[in-house]
Amino acid sequence: MSPWLPMSFLAAEDDSFYQHHGVDPVAIVRAFIYNLRNKASGGGQQGGSTITQQIIKQLLLSSERSYTRKMKEAILAYRLEHTVSKDDILQTYLNYIYLGQHSYGVEAAARTYFGKHASDITLAESAVIAGLPQAPSRYNPFRHPEAAKARQMYVLGRLRTLKWITEEQYQQAINEPLVYWSMPENRGGASKWYFEEARRLLVEFFTEENLRTLGIDTLKSGEEYVYTAGLTVRTAMDPVQQDAAGAALRRGLEELDKRQGWRGPVKKLSPAEVTEFREKSTFAPADLMGKAWVQAVVTAVDAKGARVLLGKGYTGYIPVANMSWARTPNRKISGWGAPAVRDARKVLNVNDLIMVSAAPVTVQAEGGKKGKAATKTVDFDPATASPQKPITLLLQQEPLVQGALASVETQSGDVVALIGGYQFGDSHFNRATQARRQPGSSFKPVVYSTALDFGFTPTSSVLDGPFVYVNPYTNEVWRPGNYEKNFRGIMPLYEALTLSRNTCTVRLAHKVGISNVIQRAKMLGLEPHFPQELSISLGAVAVSPLNLTQAYAAFANQGLGVRPRIITSITDNNGRELYRQDIQHWQAHTPQNAYQMATLLKNVVNSGTGSRARVDGHVIAGKTGTSNDENDAWFVGFSPSLVTGVYVGFDQLQSLGKQEQGGRTAAPIFRYYRSQIEDLYNDQPGITMQDGLAFQGVPGPGLSAIDNASEDPATGSSTPTAPDTSGGGEDLMRQMF
């Protein structure tokens, strides 16, 4: 860390640290007199605790204010001073002290307040951070910059009084501009979702009861214990996959948001605010690296595009082609193929504050045919930027729609990636684990898996036609229909799943019994309370994205269910293991059932509603899902080693827009993620055939009707019988794939 940090903390908190033995009587008397003088006037209070006492208070004792606690604090501080070196005590203090904004330790504080590592902190910045322990909220530089500056001046004054810095260093520090900002999301932002989920699980685990069971004698519990106990926590997160998942979800949500239309600028600036933007902007071309977004102010607009001010003399230009998506929102019109904007004046106005990113650049490449130069597209290079030449930009807009992505290794249950929303800084609500939404058709594999155990086969006949169900208890009538609002008649079971036909699924659930479907759902590990309602066969039950993703693992892993693992182990600061989650399997259904389901779900991706989830060169199986009124879009897909679930929807229930189904909205996000990480797994190009199964001859691909289905006139369900094999012994799997 920067040498200014320990020096600043010592000046602010305990300048005689290297002279006392854990307790400083002089400091206690000084604080008592200071507080007595300020009590009547309501002024600030001063603490007399040494750094050693503060460590004892934070790591071992509760935060109660009492003479008994202060006495314990003093005794333990004295003992600590005689067993641990001064340097180690100071190092521990700097690594564990709470500094506001969920930041513990100087490294976290440096990242939070100045967007840099502790090793890069200046004297002026060190004084700001060192001023925080007394009242992290009151001196928070984001919320109270004036108070933070005053506290910084106090710390710098102490350094000067102690002659630890020169007058020149003091003057330079007090005049140094302070720019407060946190490390942006694209630098470690995706991991915050995972770490916050792990933190939440830790707080839930370390209850007073569990601490007693573990034999831990402490007055702290929950969050207070987690932050101060010096725990070593191992998680199942794969940083490469976590970053890929975050980028994939952000890309998919931004694409959906653009299909929904332009909601307007961030703000309409007054002339005075434009002047302030121009003067205070800290823009540098490097800010646009990695497809990052920055703010800009529109300075001129015509039909062909808009000129914008970026700051520090740099300008940009947004051609109308780079804002062609920015139509007026209209949920009744599909964003797929909507008319493009052709006049920039219909989108932007002068003094609009907007978000922009650098447009890709077309450059010459090697090769070319028939005398034509070859070109390629590359990312913006800040080294090419100049104040004399506008930077070509893209108009951007932060999505309102949210989503989640969870990825689980099928054999271990390791949750290798977990993204809970578009941007962690906007909301810490983790939609992957905390949201409960209806999965729609992505629940259907539970029904089909049940049907396979009740005598149905992939070639069994099922009717896609009108279905009427009267609830015997309420007399309510339910008439489910298909998304396309049509019926296709009798079809084989595998085609009904491939095309996600609702009436076929309901008939299957009615035939095998909804209680058996619920039993299968629970065996797969699904956690909701399931009402005995036929509608749950179409996903009319709320479930979390991680829970649904985990349920699909059995289809990829020979019928073995697996418990998800986020935290794999916890050890204390003495190396004692406090918790370990071993791999936990159970037989959710037979390996034969799993093989058939995996094969059926491959067909959904190869030629059905999940075609946008295909990853070139890799075998993917999965199922799309869309809830009523296109409120929620899902895709859950897997290979033999990894299952990934994607959910997209608004936090407040509303339609995603016309034609925004799981196959169009969620499946591409799956592909963006899996195309980046698929090579990490050495999966074979197929799913292993299980004993007890045999390929069965069926009619060829031109199958138009099956005559061997008998329909129950009371229920409308079809009864499977042996399929007609007169069409020849074609291999079913070859027909499907």
Predicted regions and their residues:
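A penicillin-recognizing enzyme superfamily signal
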Residues: W4, T235, P239-Q242, G246-A248, ...
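Short, well-structured active-site flanking segments
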Residues: Y18-I28, Y104-E107, T166-Y170, K376, ...
